Amino acid sequence: MNLRVATSSDVPALRALIDLSARTLSADFYSPAQIEAAVKHVFGVDTQLIADGTYFLVETTDGPVAAGGWSARRTLYGGDQMKADADPLLDPLAEPARIRAFFVHPDWARHGLARRLYSACVDGALTAGFRRFELMATSPGEPFYASLGFTVEERVTVSLPGGVEVPFARMSRAIDSPN
């Protein structure tokens, strides 16, 4: 398995991975209506991460089986479909970097791929001068992030079109400690 920086040519395969991961791994945590609303309105590829070179994937000969990244930009979560404005850069001395858009193929869940992605994020964020991470965790993702030392700062409910509400958890941790 190869870990590499995602490129714009990976976007179609990443969209398919995100849809499959979200629909399958969220089934025990969210209702079908919540999953479909989140897939349509929240989950997706953030092409700014790809342009910045901070979105990674793990691939086999069959294509991407895991993806995730970090960001030095203000957006905390969501794909391109959530963005309406410019996405300004953060100040690494005063603001936390973002962990963004971790998705794993259901057949590869709990095989250490997300941890490999997280390690790449730590290296990149530390090199850029950041000392803290912040993220918005899905309910299925929260236990994974907690295992990395993230703590819940706030419980958030996101209201989506159609009156669907989806719970998330804003989490953070220092990144200058071992991961």
Regions found by a protein language model. Give the residues of each.
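Conserved GNAT acetyl-CoA-binding A-motif
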Residues: 118, 125-138
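Conserved G/P- and acidic residue-centered "switch" motifs that form tight phosphate/ATP-binding loops
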Residues: 10, 112-114
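Hydrophobic beta-strand residues of extracellular immunoglobulin-like
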Residues: 54-57
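Conserved catalytic-core motifs of GNAT/GCN5-like acyltransferases
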Residues: 39, 75-78, 134-136, 146, ...
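Conserved acyl-donor/pantetheine-binding loop and adjacent beta-alpha core of acyl/acetyltransferases
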Residues: 52, 65-109, 119, 124, ...
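A short beta-loop-alpha structural element at the N-terminal edge
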Residues: 2-16
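A glycine-centered beta-loop-beta connector
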Residues: 59-65
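Conserved GNAT-fold acetyl-CoA-binding loop/helix
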Residues: 19-45
